[in-house]
C-alpha cells in the first residue's frame, strides 16, 4: 500500500517556543510499515520548512510548512496518518486533517499519538473526516491495520483501534494492544 505519514507543524502561544526536535514516533511507525513492504512517505511539516512561522488567530505561532505547501508535497495515498501528541494542539491538527480530507476524499485517514490514545471517541466525534484512531504504541498496530485494510479484512480483528462502523457511524473499539516487549526488534527510524 502507499502510505503517507504527516507530522503537523508545531504550535506555541508565543510565551515559549515550540519544541522543534526530530519526531521519533512517526519515524518508527514509518520504518515498521516499510519493513512490512509498504511504500511510505513521511512529511515532517516542521523539519521541512523549519524557518517558516505564521501567526494564527492573532495569538498562536505555527512553526513549519503551510497547509497549501503540504498539498503540493503529499502524493496520492491509500492511507494518510497523522500524529497528535498534545491536547492543546488538537484544534490545529483537526484543521489539518479536514484540509487533507478535502484533497484526498478517498484516502483512509488515521491518527495516533498520546492525545488520540487518550480521547479517541472525542477525536472521531470532533473530526468527522478522521476514520480510525490507533491507540497506544503504533508500530505493530499500524502494520496490522495496513495488512487488514489491504486484504479488505475486518477492523475488529486488529487490537488497538477505535473507528466508525457502518452507515450510522457507530464507534467501535477493539481491545488495547499489548506493549512492545522486544524493543530491539523495532526497525530503526525512517528518516
Where do the model's predicted regions map?
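Glycine-rich beta-alpha loop elements in corrinoid/cobalamin-binding modules
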Residues: 2, 32-180
Amino acid at each position: 500500500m502507499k502510505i503517507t505519514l504527516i507530522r503537523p507543524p508545531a504550535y506555541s502561544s508565543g510565551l515559549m517556543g515550540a519544541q522543534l526536535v526530530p519526531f521519533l514516533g512517526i519515524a518508527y511507525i514509518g520504518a515498521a510499515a516499510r519493513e512490512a513492504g509498504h511504500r511510505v512517505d513521511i512529511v515532517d511539516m516542521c523539519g521541512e520548512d523549519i524557518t517558516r512561522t505564521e501567526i494564527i488567530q492573532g495569538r498562536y505561532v505555527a512553526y513549519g510548512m503551510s497547509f497549501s505547501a503540504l498539498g503540493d508535497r503529499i502524493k496520492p495515498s491509500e492511507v494518510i496518518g497523522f500524529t497528535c501528541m498534545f491536547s492543546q494542539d488538537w484544534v490545529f491538527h483537526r484543521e489539518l486533517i479536514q484540509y487533507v480530507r478535502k484533497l484526498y476524499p478517498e484516502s483512509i485517514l488515521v491518527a495516533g499519538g498520546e492525545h488520540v490514545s487518550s480521547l479517541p471517541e472525542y477525536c472521531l466525534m470532533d473530526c468527522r473526516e478522521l476514520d480510525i484512531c490507533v491507540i497506544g504504541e503504533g508500530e505493530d498496530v499500524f502494520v496490522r491495520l495496513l495488512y487488514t485494510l489491504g486484504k479488505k479484512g475486518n477492523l475488529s480483528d486488529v487490537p488497538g483501534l477505535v473507528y466508525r462502523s457502518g452507515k450510522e457511524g457507530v464507534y467501535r473499539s477493539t481491545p488495547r494492544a499489548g506493549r512492545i516487549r522486544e524493543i530491539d526488534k523495532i526497525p530503526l527510524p525512517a528518516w
